[in-house]
């Protein structure tokens, strides 16, 4: 390999270095920038046009004397060293250690941009992943190989929820090791310390690889971090045959860094100033999750997206929703009521849930119980709105039962302790406890066999379940 070195920097702006008279510079090529003091900085080519090359410098362009700055083109993509020893380590966006331990020394290196996967070679996501969180496991189940984002807002406990998922996630009845890759972008020192202490104190750090980008780090590094983390995840999943859960927070910080760099490049802005290629850039990250035929490992992804002004139509959550397979939406109203995790059930959805639950996965009644809970809670919210207008005393007896169900559902099912790890069996049993609060005619989405086996009838646990004319009839939207 013949390296080329040039001293033709013409301008530096926002972490970008503009080079001229560079024949043959390649997109994605790794470069080394050396300043007049001999200090080296890492960079990557992000644009080429004729003999003009644009280099993003990960450590920033501050204090660069352009006339005395050398740029060496290495004619190779940006790669990171990888080995099974990455577990338990903490790195930054370029793969440098952040844990006061030596750099990784490994003969194996992998391109941070990953290898293209033939869509035909992809396997359909299946198999239930237990997070220990009832609102997710019971109603919005996570499936191995799925992309399921968390839509949050400023001040909501998405960091605590992400840490809890990393601590508690597991595959049921699976002997293959289940490991996590945790990527944090634009977080504060206190948040970074929180994550590190959470994983250390709970004893899971040994099966977690952490990639941290702090709020005061150059935004250029933020753009590389999710790709670096996913390169590690692909190595663990498809070369070490491990099941990998990738949790990334916060993709909004990533998108804002992308907007900042795009503005410095002079790209034409689109919605709210974000570049027109925001969708394809996010897809390039999200679509690296999944399963591959004839490979035992898998990558499951849970990205956290904080919605500016709680606006779910904002470009970042909006485009994320088009790419991923559902969403977990957090509610500010539930948060103010002291409910953790404040999962807003009606707008939350897991599109692949049906492929990971039921007989031989969780329990045979799971799909029907989840449907019944959704229907009952939707009806209960209608009754709650009606009660706010006419008063609870004017409600019919059955509507009062639904009103009581709404409060009990939020306080007992959605709400749980931050250290509470509920099994899927505990979650489903709790669901049946709550359904016993409802009138019998409302239980139309479960079968007679389900009622006979699991339902707890008030007053007489031995009483036979009543016959139902249409066990699958949907509840009318209006009483």
UniProtKB/Swiss-Prot annotation:
SUPFAM superfamilies for this protein: C-terminal domain of alpha and beta subunits of F1 ATP synthase (SSF47917), P-loop containing nucleoside triphosphate hydrolases (SSF52540)
GO biological process, one term: proton motive force-driven plasma membrane ATP synthesis
InterPro entries reported in the protein's UniProt record: ATP-synt_VA_C, ATPase_a/bsu_AS, ATPase_F1/V1/A1_a/bsu_N, ATPase_F1/V1/A1_a/bsu_nucl-bd, P-loop_NTPase, V-ATPase_su_B/beta
Region of interest (Disordered), residue spans: 458-479
PROSITE patterns: ATPASE_ALPHA_BETA (PS00152)
Keyword field contains Oxidoreductase: no
Record keywords: ATP synthesis, Hydrogen ion transport, Ion transport, Transport
A molecular function (GO) term: proton-transporting ATP synthase activity, rotational mechanism
Functional description taken from the UniProt entry: Produces ATP from ADP in the presence of a proton gradient across the membrane. The V-type beta chain is a regulatory subunit.
Family: Belongs to the ATPase alpha/beta chains family.
PANTHER family, per the entry: V-TYPE PROTON ATPASE SUBUNIT B (PTHR43389:SF4)
Name of the molecule in the record: V-type ATP synthase beta chain
Species this chain originates from: Nitrosococcus oceani (strain ATCC 19707 / BCRC 17464 / JCM 30415 / NCIMB 11848 / C-107)
